Curated annotation (Swiss-Prot):
One of its GO terms (cellular component) is ribonucleoprotein complex. This is Large ribosomal subunit protein uL4. It comes from the Bacteria. Keywords: Ribonucleoprotein, Ribosomal protein, RNA-binding, rRNA-binding. It comes from Maricaulis maris (strain MCS10) (Caulobacter maris).
Length: 211
């Protein structure tokens, strides 16, 4: 399918062909998107939570109270979980929350996310994401002309330094190189902005032959 290309000045810059296998999926699977997002968020979770267990509490191990005739349970250590100051039973431990997800599932999830943006008419293609000077005001004006206020901008192989500096002062605007494209960042912003170079790299990465 063809989609029009704009400049940062909101002028026409021709059109570009989008691969239907990447951008044209009609039935977007929300369950697949959820799997990929959960995989991404699990990998970034710290997992540094920790409580002291029974064996890590420095309290007396001497038996206290009578063993018989007291009418109460027998206790062999003050570090037992039922006592104040005792160890935590089955408490959290330092661990990694990351889990595996097949590469084909991740690639399919990214294709569904891109198709969802195109289907919702929230995909904008620009010819280039570059500025002569790192001026936030100029970039804000350009985005206003394109009707963009909350967006993820995907550049080519590298992000233009002036563009990145200007964009980082704008709230709700994220800028990533094409290799950093991911499902979570695509879905968390209202609009997806791709450069022509980014589209070419996405096609090379997610085309049917490579998937």
């Amino acid at each position: 399918m063809k989609i029009e290309v704009k400049t940062l000045a909101a002028k026409d810059a021709g059109a570009i062909d989008l691969d239907d296998a990447v951008f044209g999926i009609e039935e977007v699977r929300s369950d697949l998107l959820q799997r990929v997002v959960k995989w991404q968020l699990a990998a970034r979770q710290q997992g540094t939570h920790k409580t002291l267990g029974r064996s890590e509490i420095n309290r007396t191990k001497k038996r206290f109270g009578r063993q018989k005739g007291g009418g109460t349970a027998r206790h062999g250590a003050r570090s037992a979980p039922q006592f104040v100051g005792g160890g935590k039973a089955h408490g959290p431990r330092v661990r990694s929350h990351a889990h595996e997800l097949p590469k084909k599932v991740r690639a399919l999830g990214l294709r569904h996310a891109l198709s969802a943006k195109l289907g919702a008419k929230s995909l904008v293609i620009i010819d280039d994401a570059a500025l002569d000077a790192p001026q936030t005001k100029a970039l804000r004006t350009s985005f206003e002309g394109l009707g963009i206020s909350n967006a993820l901008v995907i550049s080519g192989a590298e992000v233009n330094e002036n563009f990145a500096k200007a964009a980082r002062n704008l709230p709700c605007i994220d800028v990533l190189p094409a290799q950093g494209l991911n499902v979570y960042d695509v879905l968390r912003r209202d609009t997806l902005v791709l450069t022509k170079a980014a589209v070419e790299q996405i096609h090379a990465r997610l085309s049917a032959k490579e998937a």
